[in-house]
């Protein structure tokens, strides 16, 4: 049954007059699935409600931060109390230190942490710090790994084993792109070749320990360990971008889950409890290079603001409770098994990847281990799948190359309804 979204259609038309593309982040426009975006009015627990009154079980969770679900009472209460004291001061607060202590205690590789306002700020600052610490300029990233929209990270790979960066976006100067080298995720041999040729000029390797922006792609056994070994051998730093995976896949992030310690870690999403936030941290001798302790400059008007710190502390306090990650694993495993069975019953041979409470259904029968294999997915079939799910009250990311996020708020009834709707959506995709 077609979804009634008349008010959302009208709202999108109005938004496009004053906002580029009608949205403040491109994927929200539903362009890749050929639909009009739904405009959300409110959220409650595992559900979101659009301005036309439609209710959806939400697996976007504001793109990952809402691991507790919408309007968790402890987060809401903490924010209400904080608002009574003010919104921002541009001065040190006890909340900043409390948040920093929680983070460094959770991440064994981190002695100090600096708060910023977004994941992009965190990765941008981490790269500047790595260059300042090593005195080198080149950065290695992996194709399909997204680290925010800083110039040096908006780079894709060309052909050949060792390719200097080519800008993905207009507006990125070639001389900036030339300092970014692109490797292939899960391909240690290529990375070894890159270091053999460029190792003395490489300041850092930056990676998502679980790639979450080409679907969900876990590291092959030995891959992260191999990257760690190569960076140490050549005197480069290892930056783990845990903006998505930090406190999502494990308390202490993917680096604790896989037991590989980076030099610098970037965080965001969950540590703000749904408010704008970012952070980067690492070993003391590296972090003491950051101003005002050292010469590497970074600043921010709203960095460490009380509201984000309050929401983040409340969220992390709940996550620290006994059994929380076991609950998330149980829910996520149940959903994954149900989706696999629904796809089989619908006659589709698909590939599923999951790490903790983030998972992805790839519309390909090929094992997905990197950007190239992720791109074998049938995006037209995914678009049919997405549309059918939306019509049946299930809200997932409007892109084949994004994760589904399970939250503590998802009930067994939510998961069962999702599996039932997915069977219908898989059938529709199979017939497309």
From Swiss-Prot:
Annotated EC: 5.4.3.8
GO biological processes: protoporphyrinogen IX biosynthetic process
UniProt entry tagged with the keyword Cytoplasm: yes
Keywords assigned: Cytoplasm, Isomerase, Porphyrin biosynthesis, Pyridoxal phosphate
PROSITE patterns tied to this protein: AA_TRANSFER_CLASS_3
Entry-linked Pfam families: Aminotran_3
Cofactor(s) this protein cannot do without: pyridoxal 5'-phosphate
Name of this chain's protein: Glutamate-1-semialdehyde 2,1-aminomutase
Native species: Carboxydothermus hydrogenoformans (strain ATCC BAA-161 / DSM 6008 / Z-2901)
Top-level taxonomy: Bacteria, Bacillati, Bacillota, Clostridia, Thermoanaerobacterales
């Amino acid at each position: 049954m077609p979804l009634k979204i008349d008010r959302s259609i009208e709202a999108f038309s109005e938004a496009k007059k004053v906002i580029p593309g009608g949205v403040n982040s491109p994927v929200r426009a539903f362009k890749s699935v050929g639909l009009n975006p739904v405009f959300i009015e409110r959220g409650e627990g595992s559900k979101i409600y659009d301005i036309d009154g439609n209710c959806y079980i939400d697996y976007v969770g504001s793109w990952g931060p809402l691991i507790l679900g919408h309007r968790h009472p402890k987060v809401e209460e903490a924010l209400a109390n904080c608002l009574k004291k003010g919104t921002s001061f541009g001065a040190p607060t006890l909340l900043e230190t409390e948040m920093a202590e929680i983070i460094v205690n959770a991440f064994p590789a981190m002695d100090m942490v600096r708060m910023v306002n977004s994941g992009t700020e965190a990765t941008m600052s981490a790269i500047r710090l790595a260059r300042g610490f090593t005195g080198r300029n080149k950065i290695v990233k992996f194709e399909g790994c997204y680290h925010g929209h800083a110039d040096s990270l908006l780079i894709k790979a060309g052909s050949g084993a060792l390719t200097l960066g080519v800008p993905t976006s207009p507006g990125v100067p070639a001389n900036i792109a030339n300092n970014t080298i692109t490797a292939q995720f899960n391909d240690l041999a290529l990375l070894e070749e890159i270091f053999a040729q460029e190792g003395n000029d490489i300041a850092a390797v930056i990676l998502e320990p679980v790639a979450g922006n080409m679907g969900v792609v876990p590291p092959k056994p030995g891959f992260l360990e191999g990257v760690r070994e190569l960076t140490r051998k050549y005197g480069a730093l290892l930056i783990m971008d845990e903006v998505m995976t930090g406190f999502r896949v494990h308390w202490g992030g993917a680096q604790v889950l896989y037991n590989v310690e980076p030099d610098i870690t970037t965080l965001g999403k969950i540590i703000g409890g749904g408010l704008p936030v970012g952070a980067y941290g690492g070993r003391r001798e590296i972090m003491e290079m950051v101003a005002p302790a050292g010469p590497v400059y970074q600043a921010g008007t709203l960095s460490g603001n009380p509201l984000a710190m309050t929401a983040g502390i409340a969220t992390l306090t709940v996550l620290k409770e006994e059994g929380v990650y076991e609950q998330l694993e149980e829910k996520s495993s149940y959903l994954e098994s149900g989706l696999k069975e629904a796809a089989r019953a619908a006659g589709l041979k698909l590939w599923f990847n999951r790490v903790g409470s983030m998972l992805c259904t790839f519309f390909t029968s090929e094992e997905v281990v990197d950007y190239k294999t992720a791109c074998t997915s049938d995006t037209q079939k995914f678009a049919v799948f997405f549309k059918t799910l939306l019509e049946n009250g299930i809200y997932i990311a409007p892109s084949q190359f994004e994760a589904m996020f399970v939250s503590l708020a998802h009930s067994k009834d939510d998961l069962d309804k999702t599996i039932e709707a997915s069977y219908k959506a898989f059938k529709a995709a199979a017939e497309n």
